[in-house]
């Protein structure tokens, strides 16, 4: 029986994880649930899954949850960073699902790694912001790191065992691998006239053709910044050089990514677009469990198509690839700027195409300095957010 803590329990990844746990009740136990401020959702999850600990990032939300949670459930409600870090490093905890969206997930995810936990990584920003520090912490602690993102999980499944066992430190060329092919659907605006993009609304941007996701990730998919962040994440997970990584537009989201070998072979991971599949794979690795996802019906798939990315349509993807080439400081800046820009777009403060403008302004202007600690990373993140907000004020 694995005791699990779910960071981001009330989000889409959290819901999918709990669904897989419910389908395999004799193998997994919910030890802790972590959410920001969604009291009603957390209450329902506590009643359904009966964790030992329910942690609310928002103090007022924690107080509300304590007031409405039935005492008979005997669930400890906590709040504050110290309690959160104590939860993810607790001796009773075996596995941590890291699914808090954005920079907010970095510190607890890194602490779980330092504690040597089995970490299921759905928070891509942890590697985007602190790739080298994160990988080094994994190496020192002996933590097991498994990628949950559908693309990185697909790549992982297509790799030989010696690479799987050495994430972040592997040598792809030595294992006969020539390229990693990172697929992306192109989002809801793949076929839209370029002239119409500036007027696209948050509701339109969040209407993904294949996947069900939260608002921030949905907008990132529409700009293809999501693929850009995944490009950066893949660089750290698989220790790649720039020339070993390629982005492929694949609108059907049937092939979740591919690995090309020196001999000309290409191994692809396929399946219906449902996050329960990669989640179940990570939870059970190296075994397999039931995910609740219907297997792919090849007779209904139809045509599979592939295209090169259009950087005029997707400038955020180009910015992410450029930042990846520049290094860790640039990717930290880009991630912080993008979080501010996307939130502003969702609130109606800026237009869709202005997201890329904010990101580019920050990437060009914010001073980059060497980062040797988590404190350095968080300081650069905070500085970038200040500049991004100033940029918003100038273009709004």
UniProtKB/Swiss-Prot annotation:
To which pathway does this protein belong?
A: Isoprenoid biosynthesis; isopentenyl diphosphate biosynthesis via DXP pathway; isopentenyl diphosphate from 1-deoxy-D-xylulose 5-phosphate: step 1/6
Has UniProt tagged this entry with the keyword Zinc?
no
Q: Does the keyword Plastid apply?
A: no
EC number(s)? Answer: 1.1.1.267
What the entry lists under InterPro entries is as follows: DXP_reductoisomerase, DXP_reductoisomerase_C, DXP_reductoisomerase_N, DXPR_C, DXPR_C_sf, NAD(P)-bd_dom_sf
Q: Which HAMAP family match?
A: DXP_reductoisom
Q: What does this protein do?
A: Catalyzes the NADPH-dependent rearrangement and reduction of 1-deoxy-D-xylulose-5-phosphate (DXP) to 2-C-methyl-D-erythritol 4-phosphate (MEP).
Q: Which family does it belong to?
A: Belongs to the DXR family.
Protein name according to UniProt: 1-deoxy-D-xylulose 5-phosphate reductoisomerase
């Amino acid at each position: 029986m694995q005791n699990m803590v779910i960071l981001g329990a009330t989000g889409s990844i959290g819901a999918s994880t709990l669904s897989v746990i419910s389908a395999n009740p004799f193998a997994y136990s919910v030890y802790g649930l972590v959410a920001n401020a969604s009291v009603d959702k957390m209450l329902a999850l506590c009643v359904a899954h009966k964790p030992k600990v329910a942690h609310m990032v928002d103090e007022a939300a924690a107080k509300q949850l304590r007031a409405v949670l039935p005492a008979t459930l005997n669930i400890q409600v906590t709040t504050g960073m110290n309690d959160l870090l104590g939860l993810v490093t607790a001796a009773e905890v075996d596995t941590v699902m890291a699914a808090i969206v954005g920079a907010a997930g970095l510190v607890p995810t890194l602490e779980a790694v330092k504690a040597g936990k089995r970490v299921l990584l759905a928070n891509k920003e942890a590697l985007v912001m602190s790739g080298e520090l994160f990988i080094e912490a994994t190496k020192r602690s002996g933590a097991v790191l498994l990628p949950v993102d559908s693309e990185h999980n697909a790549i992982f499944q297509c790799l030989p065992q010696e690479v799987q066992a050495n994430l972040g430190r592997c040598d792809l060329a030595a294992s006969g691998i020539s390229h990693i092919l990172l697929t992306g659907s192109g989002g809801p605006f793949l076929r839209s006239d370029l002239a119409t993009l500036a007027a696209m609304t948050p509701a339109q941007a969040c209407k993904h053709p294949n996947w069900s996701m939260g608002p921030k990730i949905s907008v990132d998919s529409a700009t293809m910044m999501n693929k850009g962040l995944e490009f950066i994440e893949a660089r750290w997970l698989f220790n790649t050089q720039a020339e070993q990584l390629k982005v492929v537009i694949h609108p059907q989201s049937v092939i979740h990514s591919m690995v090309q070998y020196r001999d000309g072979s290409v191994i692809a991971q396929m399946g219906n677009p449902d996050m329960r599949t990669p989640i179940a794979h990570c939870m059970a690795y190296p075994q397999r469990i039931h995910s609740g996802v219907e297997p792919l019906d090849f007779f209904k798939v139809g045509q599979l198509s592939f295209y090169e990315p259009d950087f005029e349509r997707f400038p955020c993807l180009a910015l992410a690839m450029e930042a990846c080439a520049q290094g860790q400081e640039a990717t930290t800046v880009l991630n912080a700027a993008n979080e501010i820009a996307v939130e502003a777009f969702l609130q109606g403060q800026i237009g869709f195409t202005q997201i890329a403008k904010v990101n580019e302004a920050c990437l060009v202007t914010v001073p980059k300095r060497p980062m040797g600690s988590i404190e350095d990373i968080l300081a650069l993140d905070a500085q970038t957010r200040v500049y991004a907000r100033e940029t918003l004020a100038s273009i709004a």
